[in-house]
Amino acid sequence: MAAKLLYCTQWRIRMATLTVFTPAYNRAHTLPRTYESLQKQSCKDFVWLIVDDGSKDQTAKLVKEWQQQEKTFEIRYIYKENGGMHTAHNVAYENIDTELNVCIDSDDCMADGAVKKIIDTWEKVRDKNYAGLIGLDADFKGNIIGKGFPEHLKETTLGDYYAAGGQGDKKLVYRTD
């Protein structure tokens, strides 16, 4: 696949594959954990999009500092009037320009190596007619939330997974188009 030119900053000339988006409302106290988990990613082929849903705390100031310091991945910030998490998701989807996207909540973190695993897996299945990928979620101690996937299950819809007895949170990575 030929690289798409998006823009040239001091560190990026190729369009990223993944947008990690984070809706946030008064989360200056939890966003550092999310940011640190993104800094630890071995693969930096992503953009972090923070949609601030009308925060009154120091979220904007904190993100501006990160934008000035961060050199390994792009951080985008959008402020909007408070309307609820669902409206922040809508704004995110209106502004995503990468092939894939995933939501990481403002009080969560991304597991080490997750970006690489997402992109490597996508490279293997991108030409199939998939809407995205489903992964397992874990708590901060690494315990899987709910049930894992049956060994025989290689593809499914999320609805069919739950109808077959699947349980727990799952991490959904969507094809943007």
Where do the language-model regions lie?
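A conserved acidic beta->alpha catalytic loop
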Residues: 37, 52-61
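Glycine-rich, basic loop-to-helix element that forms the pyrophosphate-binding segment
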Residues: 80-96
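Short aromatic/hydrophobic "clamp" motif used to bind/position activated sugar donors
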Residues: 101
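Conserved donor NDP-sugar-binding/catalytic core segment of glycosyltransferases
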Residues: 113-146
